[in-house]
Regions:
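Cross-kingdom leucine-rich repeat
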Residues: 1-369
Length: 369
């Protein structure tokens, strides 16, 4: 504990990471009225600590007066940090809606979070969705954005401040969306393709979003996306359209799991059926527990996978054919059916193998009856 003007702070000069999870009854770090000073702190993550206040803000920045415990003459919630003293070296930060909105509305200096590269937003239950279009002004160097446990129906709206912020120095490279039970759309239709959250996007992970209707609007091009994983999104009927598929020239890894309503991975849009769709760099593809999946695509397009080496299929009982059109996979030599014991099947080509596996399952079902 420090003396003099800093007597109300406790210093941990070498602490680089602080993670607090599920401490529902903890109200303060120290029983007295003291905040922390951690000048070397790089990672600050606080989740599900409802009684704990993370930051104290300047009275000039707070529109509502703080609640006071009249018996002890002190705030009910003793903050961990003074916003003015938070480490300027933070690179990984988790924020709830209350703190995030105060920061966005001028609750701190603009240079407080200049070095933050990973921003984790959680429990935005009553927050206007427009926040997600403006956060980059306070966090200009964020390259990884995580949103979880919130009530958004649409994450990113089109137009307005979105386009202005597309000129920010850093663009989002990774977008992680977890446990967004009310989410219906990630991007609004006609969303600007040069927006900072789309332009350089390399990784997209969407987990436990059961009401998601559309993953990507067909108007968006994801030309830098290399990794796409979608798990437990039960409302998706298809993953992407053929127009979006054509933009995925850098995609290397595709994993789809536990999407029980999905009928096709690629849906035919207005593109001409005879046109080719080339996944130039796709090396790994996995379909797991897709109980309604009938095909990769039910159209006549030619699908070319010049780099595909591994294809894992498990728990897809309705998969009858890979594609109704031509499928070219020059380096694929087998379909992995069970990863744990490396069960691999292959007959002539990808379509023939899928057809043969479906026939065998049908024969097996008839014998069991």
């Amino acid at each position: 504990m420090e003396n003099g003007s800093m007597k109300n702070s406790i210093s941990f000069p070498r602490l680089t990471e602080m993670t607090l999870i599920g401490l529902t009854n903890v109200k303060s770090f120290y029983p007295e009225k003291h905040t922390l000073e951690c000048p070397s702190l790089n990672v600050l993550k606080v989740y599900r600590c409802e009684a704990l206040k993370m930051f104290s803000f300047s009275p000039l920045c707070c529109k509502q007066p703080a609640q006071v415990d009249e018996i002890h003459d002190m705030p009910f919630q003793i903050p961990l940090f003074s916003i003015e003293k938070v480490s300027p070296n933070l690179k990984d930060l988790a924020l709830c809606s209350k703190d995030a909105l105060k920061i966005l509305n001028g609750g701190c200096l603009e240079n407080n979070f200049q070095k933050v590269e990973v921003l984790r937003l959680h429990h935005f239950d009553e927050t206007p969705v427009t926040f997600l279009n403006g956060f980059h002004a306070m966090f200009p160097n964020v390259v990884t954005l995580q949103v979880r446990g919130s009530s958004f129906e649409i994450l990113f709206l089109s137009g307005g401040i979105d386009h202005i912020n597309s000129q920010s120095p850093k663009k989002i490279q990774n977008l992680w969306l977890f446990e967004l039970e009310q989410l219906r759309f990630i991007w609004q239709e006609n969303f600007a393709g040069d927006h900072f959250v789309v332009q350089d996007l390399e990784g997209l992970t969407v987990l436990n979003c059961p009401n998601l209707i559309t993953l990507v609007p067909s108007s968006l091009s994801l030309k830098y996306l290399t990794d796409l994983e979608v798990n437990n999104c039960k409302g998706l009927i298809y993953l992407i359209t053929t127009k979006t598929a054509k933009s995925l020239v850098q995609l290397k890894r595709l994993v789809i799991a536990n999407c029980e309503m999905m009928l096709d991975v690629v849906k035919i849009d207005e593109e001409k059926e005879e046109e080719e769709v080339i996944f130039e760099n796709l090396e790994f593809m996995e379909f797991f527990s897709l109980s309604s999946l009938g095909s990769f695509c039910n159209g006549k397009q030619t699908f070319i996978f010049p780099s595909l080496l591994h294809f894992v299929v498990q728990g897809c009982p309705q998969l009858k054919i890979f594609s109704s059109g031509v499928t070219i996979t020059p380096f694929l030599t087998g379909i992995t059916l069970r990863v744990e014991n490396r069960r691999i099947r292959w007959k002539d080509d990808l379509n023939t193998t899928i057809e043969q596996l479906f026939i065998e399952k049908e024969v097996s079902r008839s014998i069991e009856k």
